[in-house]
Amino acid sequence: MPGKWISALLLLQISCCFRSVKCGKVLVWPMEFSHWMNIKIILDELVQRGHEVTVLRPSAYYVLDPKKSPGLKFETFPTSVSKDNLENFFIKFVDVWTYEMPRDTCLSYSPLLQNMIDEFSDYFLSLCKDVVSNKELMTKLQESKFDVLLSDPVASCGELIAELLQIPFLYSIRFSPGYQIEKSSGRFLLPPSYVPVILSGLGGQMTFIERIKNMICMLYFDFWFQMFNDKKWDSFYSEYLGRPTTLVETMGQAEMWLIRSNWDLEFPHPTLPNVDYVGGLHCKPAKPLPKDMEEFVQSSGDHGVVVFSLGSMVSNMTEEKANAIAWALAQIPQKVLWKFDGKTPATLGHNTRVYKWLPQNDLLGHPKTKAFVTHGGANGVYEAIYHGIPMIGIPLFGEQHDNIAHMVAKGAAVALNIRTMSKSDVLNALEEVIENPFYKKNAIWLSTIHHDQPMKPLDRAVFWIEFVMRHKRAKHLRPLGHNLTWYQYHSLDVIGFLLSCVATTIVLSVKCLLFIYRFFVKKENKMKNE
């Protein structure tokens, strides 16, 4: 009987594969950390549907572990960048952004951000050179005849590999600083009058002063900030493609952009047909908790529990700050499950248990969970939205400030500043979110609209990948704006022509009037003289 069931399941999988698209070959150029965790969800689903997925893995990557992904194939290639160097860079990157970077305006943090991004760009340029100069690997990839490439544009190079292999490619991205990649390479439409620029930390309904700040941010990211060292990348891409080109032009060839966000987190703005918002694709129903954890949760009674996690990349919280947080947690009647990897705080209460790892999604989906203290990472925020849990946000770096600002604007969170918050601030925020039904009501509303979609985010992401494999491209969805120069795109040539026409008309009209005036004046003077 089991053998029959296995055969039936295999037959069903094969039939599903043929119904949607022939079982294809997908090549992946990934990014590390949460970027990899998100894209891996898509890859696992592709494997479930019968596709063959191969991941290009730089040997310097240390989070992306092939042993934890048995269904995927990996091509690990040697790199000139060491694993220790890359790890130390990312740790420094997070620490500087969390504790040193000014947050007043975009201009206040711009020099520090640009320095970090320049170093980031150099690392990935080295990784890109390592992979495309590896003739043995590139020959193997060429012979494998992949159907499509899936890439994270924050880690540039996927588009170059796709061009060299002559296959279509798609992007999976949460954001780039200031939406620079999205605007320059994707031609995204993001009016600064009502769309907050990412990394501005602004919410949806902006005041006049906030719109000024937003405009300054947009101008900075559009005209001064460089996500990648353009000259280096442009020269490198031109050399390997054998023709003059630019990084922006090459990235602009993407068939589809899969944005790891959605309208329950974002604010409405214009979008394009080759862009789909698939935020929350990793979310799923909660599973049962481990026995000892379930017993602790149940012991909370009617008060319920609070889940506390500031992510996996921050482990250097000061002892003073940890004690302030622990003291505040000890004052509430709820039981607390705290993901914390450090010295146990002296003020830790009897109601609080510290764990090095938490089944976060399963806890957020537990009926006794009352609130979620989070750093505001997109994954955690979406899990809270999925399960309808209000948040206390303590953003640390990246777009976390923006995520929490959006949740505050939507009435599902309260924000704290990790640099300035006191123990009383933490306690007041906890009591406000737990006791005020306003936050729970809005969290449930966000959860409701997240679930009320015609197609699950993960299914949409996979659909578009299979769509590109079926049709070999999706050029009919790609805006023609990609074929225009920057001045044509903004109609500056048309505006200049029309202004010149108006100016010419005005000049000719004035000259005609002057001629007529002089003619009649001369005629009148002549008549008087006679």
From Swiss-Prot:
Give the transmembrane region(s).
494-510
Q: What class of enzyme is it?
A: transferase
Kindly report the protein's main subcellular placement as a broad class: endoplasmic reticulum
Is the Glycosyltransferase keyword given for this protein? yes
Positions of glycan attachment: 316, 483
The way it spans or sits in the membrane comes to: Single-pass membrane protein
Q: Name one GO biological process term.
A: estrogen metabolic process
* One matching Pfam family: UDPGT
Q: GO molecular-function annotation terms?
A: glucuronosyltransferase activity
EC number annotated for this UniProt entry: 2.4.1.17
Catalytic activity from the UniProt record: glucuronate acceptor + UDP-alpha-D-glucuronate = acceptor beta-D-glucuronoside + UDP + H(+); 17alpha-estradiol + UDP-alpha-D-glucuronate = 17alpha-estradiol 3-O-(beta-D-glucuronate) + UDP + H(+); 17alpha-estradiol + UDP-alpha-D-glucuronate = 17alpha-estradiol 17-O-(beta-D-glucuronate) + UDP + H(+); 17beta-estradiol + UDP-alpha-D-glucuronate = 17beta-estradiol 17-O-(beta-D-glucuronate) + UDP + H(+)
Task: Give me the Gene Ontology terms describing cellular component.
Answer: endoplasmic reticulum membrane; mitochondrial inner membrane
The UniProt keywords, alphabetically, are: Endoplasmic reticulum, Glycoprotein, Glycosyltransferase, Lipid metabolism, Membrane, Signal, Steroid metabolism, Transferase, Transmembrane, Transmembrane helix
Q: Out of the domains of life, which is the source?
A: Eukaryota
**Signal peptide extent:** 1-23
Q: Where in the cell is it found?
A: Endoplasmic reticulum membrane
Describe the function of this protein: UDP-glucuronosyltransferase (UGT) that catalyzes phase II biotransformation reactions in which lipophilic substrates are conjugated with glucuronic acid to increase the metabolite's water solubility, thereby facilitating excretion into either the urine or bile. Catalyzes the glucuronidation of endogenous steroid hormones such as androgens (epitestosterone, androsterone) and estrogens (estradiol, epiestradiol).
Protein family according to the UniProt entry: Belongs to the UDP-glycosyltransferase family.
Name of the protein: UDP-glucuronosyltransferase 2B17
As recorded in Swiss-Prot or TrEMBL, the protein's gene is named Ugt2b17
